[in-house]
Amino acid sequence: MTPLLTLFLVALIGLPLAQALDCHVCAYNGDNCFNPMRCPAMVAYCMTTRTYYTPTRMKVSKSCVPSCFETVYDGYSKHASTTSCCQYDLCNGAGFAAPATLALAPILLATLWGLL
């Protein structure tokens, strides 16, 4: 019995401890926001969502989420939006993690079309 208990304790000590993910968590009307925060243990992703009200006015939201689905353009809502996800500490702090300018062209066209 003692060798089995010793083996169990050695195996238990060898397990890596789960570390919580650090993400920026904030909501800001403008280009970007930074507010580092330790996420709860069950969180697997840092998420950044940008909602475009007009081609020059947007809202940035950053959060900790347990699951994440990236989108380039969400055409189901009134305003265009993009969502990006990442899985390492403070990975959602980049200045502009959304798709490149060329990829934003359909969003801008849809926004302009909606204004007509």
Swiss-Prot record:
InterPro entries registered for this protein in UniProt: Ly-6/neurotoxin-like_GPI-ap (IPR051110), LY6_UPA_recep-like (IPR016054), Snake_toxin-like_sf (IPR045860), Toxin/TOLIP (IPR035076)
Gene3D superfamilies in the record: CD59
Domain (UPAR/Ly6): residue spans on this chain: 21-105
Cysteines paired by S-S bonds: C23-C46, C26-C33, C39-C64, C68-C85, C86-C91
Mode of membrane association: Lipid-anchor; GPI-anchor
Subcellular location: Cell membrane; Cell projection, Dendrite; Endoplasmic reticulum
Pfam families, A to Z: Toxin_TOLIP
A GO biological process held by the record: regulation of neurotransmitter receptor activity
Record-level GO cellular component terms: dendrite; endoplasmic reticulum; plasma membrane; side of membrane; synapse
Propeptide residue intervals: 93-116
Positions of GPI-anchor amidated asparagine lipidation: N92
Keywords from the UniProt entry: Cell membrane, Cell projection, Disulfide bond, Endoplasmic reticulum, Glycoprotein, GPI-anchor, Lipoprotein, Membrane, Signal
One annotated GO molecular function: ion channel inhibitor activity
Signal sequence coordinates: 1-20
Subunit structure: Interacts with nAChRs containing alpha-4:beta-2 (CHRNA4:CHRNB2) and alpha-7 (CHRNA7) subunits. Interacts with CHRNA4 probably in the endoplasmic reticulum prior to nAChR pentameric assembly. Interacts with KCNA2/Potassium voltage-gated channel subfamily A member 2.
Function recorded in the entry: Acts in different tissues through interaction to nicotinic acetylcholine receptors (nAChRs). The proposed role as modulator of nAChR activity seems to be dependent on the nAChR subtype and stoichiometry, and to involve an effect on nAChR trafficking and its cell surface expression, and on single channel properties of the nAChR inserted in the plasma membrane. Modulates functional properties of nicotinic acetylcholine receptors (nAChRs) to prevent excessive excitation, and hence neurodegeneration.
Official protein name in the record: Ly-6/neurotoxin-like protein 1
Organism name: Saimiri boliviensis boliviensis (Bolivian squirrel monkey)
Lineage of producing organism: Eukaryota, Metazoa, Chordata, Craniata, Vertebrata
